[in-house]
UniProtKB/Swiss-Prot annotation:
GO molecular function: uroporphyrinogen decarboxylase activity
Family that this chain belongs to: Belongs to the uroporphyrinogen decarboxylase family.
Superkingdom of the source species: Bacteria
GO biological process: protoporphyrinogen IX biosynthetic process from glutamate
Tagged with keyword Cytoplasm: yes
Lineage: Bacteria, Pseudomonadati, Pseudomonadota, Alphaproteobacteria, Hyphomicrobiales
Annotated protein name in UniProt: Uroporphyrinogen decarboxylase
Species in which this protein is naturally found: Nitrobacter hamburgensis (strain DSM 10229 / NCIMB 13809 / X14)
InterPro entries linked to this entry: UROD/MetE-like_sf, Uroporphyrinogen_deCO2ase_HemE, Uroporphyrinogen_deCOase
A Pfam family: URO-D
Length: 350
């Protein structure tokens, strides 16, 4: 029997139905490895200009869908748009990444606005509406935000650091002041995600890129609990909202994360222990991941083996095939095509 053309395989997995061929997309799939992205990026000027010009953001979002026919598009934006909407200075320096005015003392934290100006994020919502109109009926649309812990690490330090020590130190020395930053980010992340659902997103992902630097007690307080509050806040308004969590580097704490947060799926990095994930995680929620981005750069037989390992480990349950983190700019496009062929041919090998 032919598959219903209106069914989105990505949403089927999140709704509890394993797919013989796992749906596939990539974190950072709209990015510098694509020549069409680089061309539009140069035309846009600054990175935030690219994010906040709906015509450009929508086009960049759609580029990898046109080229690779992924099962999901993720809106082109950045996790630091909420600090921007809170009135913080956010800049992207070429070759250096984001720069913000640091909130590294209790007095500085006290200057943080409580409520984000959502009109500043209207370009993101408009880009979502444009993409929604262009996607076919089988392709899901993902909206996202950064988890409060990860966003706070950039806000406190004013930049990315190797281990985000400034935020960790502030959380130890001034937990009340740090908690106020987290509270503001929780409240405004809920508002932002609800706006994305209203604009056409099918699914939401919460990126906690720096979760893995936290010890277990702090992980529970600063990663799990804020994420739980966001999920609860979104579902209070949209009870059936589908939400994916990505606590990168959580490792053995993944079972605690899914139990407490209530996410529908969890994205895992390439170092996650397969047996733990199968037994303690995938038995309860869908799993997304977890190809090493360097295997994708390597290509050839090494890439085939790495893809097959992910499928062998997780395709027996509910799996969304993805990378364990974002695709690297130097990744050859033929290697992406090789990965997709390997994954989509897996149903024939069952």
């Amino acid at each position: 029997m032919a598959q219903d053309s209106t069914i989105k395989p990505f949403l089927e997995v999140l709704s509890g139905r394993r797919q013989a061929v796992p749906p596939i997309w990539m974190m950072r799939q709209a990015g510098r490895y694509l020549p069409e992205y680089r061309e539009l990026r140069a035309k846009a000027g600054g990175f935030l200009d690219l994010c906040f010009t709906p015509e450009f953001a929508a086009e960049v979002t759609l580029q990898p869908i046109r080229r690779f026919a992924f099962d999901a598009a993720i809106i082109f934006s950045d996790i630091l748009v909420i600090p921007y909407a809170l009135g913080r200075s956010v800049r992207f320096e070429v070759g250096e990444g984001p720069r913000l005015d640091p909130l590294d003392t209790p007095d500085m934290a006290a200057t943080l606005s409580r409520e984000a100006d959502m009109t500043k994020l209207e370009p993101v919502f408009e880009a979502l509406r444009r993409v929604r109109r262009e996607l076919d009926s089988k392709t899901a649309l993902i909206g996202f935000c950064g988890a409060p812990w990860t966003v706070a690490t950039y806000m406190v330090a004013g930049r990315g650091t190797p281990d985000q020590a400034p935020a960790r130190m502030m959380a130890y020395r001034h937990p009340e002041a740090f908690a106020k930053i987290i509270d503001v980010l929780v409240e405004n992340s809920v508002r932002y995600l609800l706006g994305q659902l209203k604009a056409g997103a099918d699914v939401l992902q919460i990126f906690d890129t720096w979760a893995g630097v936290l010890p277990p007690r702090e992980f529970a307080r600063w990663s799990i609990e804020p994420t739980r509050r966001i999920v609860e806040g979104v579902r209070k308004i949209v009870p059936d909202a589908k939400i994916i969590g990505f606590p990168r580097g959580a490792g053995a704490l993944l079972p605690s994360y899914i139990e407490a947060t209530g996410v529908d799926a969890v994205s895992i990095d390439w170092a996650a222990e397969p047996s733990l994930v199968r037994e303690k995680v995938q038995s309860r929620v869908a799993v997304q991941g977890n190809l090493d981005p360097l295997a994708l750069i390597a290509g050839g037989a090494a890439l085939d083996r790495a893809v097959d390992d992910v499928l062998a480990n997780f395709a027996g349950g509910r799996l969304i095939f993805n990378l364990g983190h974002g695709i690297q700019p130097e990744t050859p496009i033929p290697h992406v095509e090789q990965m997709i062929r390997r994954v989509r041919g897996s149903g024939l090998r069952e």
